[in-house]
């Protein structure tokens, strides 16, 4: 299966393979093992926007102990694959619905899905807590497969703003014709 193989940022054939058995081999298989991976990654890596580097691999993330959500995700995916758990990279937006607002602007986010018991489940090693409001943009083996922007020539981003709003339950129960009235 494609999501068990090494990829550009998830080097399954590295020292992480031996480490994964030591760290997680005694965990209960399935969901508990993937959650143990998320727990470890979230505790081992320090989130720091200022340390973002687009070409950081899972092994470098493990050694440097710092990174952004894509780095947390690559390391967790690599551990899963090392333990024969198919895992794929997800990129999109993650708002602050149901949690305190973050002190920094909303940005593109990364999480992963693990294939357990015949279906894919979302995990987030960076936040390591269930969240609502994910807006999935792309899936792939790692970040190399799912570039959210590709530019050509000289350019400079002038502004970038993302927001999500929770839709109230009563709004969802209105007849279709009344949707236009809400706007």
Model-identified regions with their sequence ranges:
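Secondary-structure boundary elements
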Residues: 1-67, 75, 143, 155-175, ...
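Hydrophobic/aromatic-rich core segments of domains that either
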Residues: 39, 71-159
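Active-site neighborhood of glycoside hydrolase catalytic domains
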Residues: 183
């Amino acid at each position: 299966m494609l999501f068990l193989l090494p990829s550009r940022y998830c080097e399954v054939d590295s020292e992480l393979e031996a480490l994964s058995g030591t760290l997680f081999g005694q965990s209960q298989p399935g969901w508990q093992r993937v959650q143990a991976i998320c727990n470890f990654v979230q505790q081992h890596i320090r989130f720091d926007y200022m340390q973002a580097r687009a070409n950081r691999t899972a092994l470098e993330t493990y050694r440097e102990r710092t990174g952004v959500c894509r780095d947390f995700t690559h390391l967790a995916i690599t551990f899963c694959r090392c333990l024969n758990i198919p895992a794929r990279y997800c990129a999109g937006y993650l708002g602050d619905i149901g949690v305190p607002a973050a002190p920094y602007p909303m940005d593109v986010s990364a999480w992963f899905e693990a294939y357990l018991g015949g279906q894919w489940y979302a995990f987030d090693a960076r936040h390591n807590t269930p969240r609502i409001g994910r807006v999935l943009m792309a899936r792939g083996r790692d970040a190399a497969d799912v570039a959210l922007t590709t530019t050509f020539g000289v350019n400079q981003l002038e502004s970038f703003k993302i927001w999500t709003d929770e839709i109230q339950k009563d709004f969802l129960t209105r007849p279709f014709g009344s949707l236009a009235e809400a706007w």
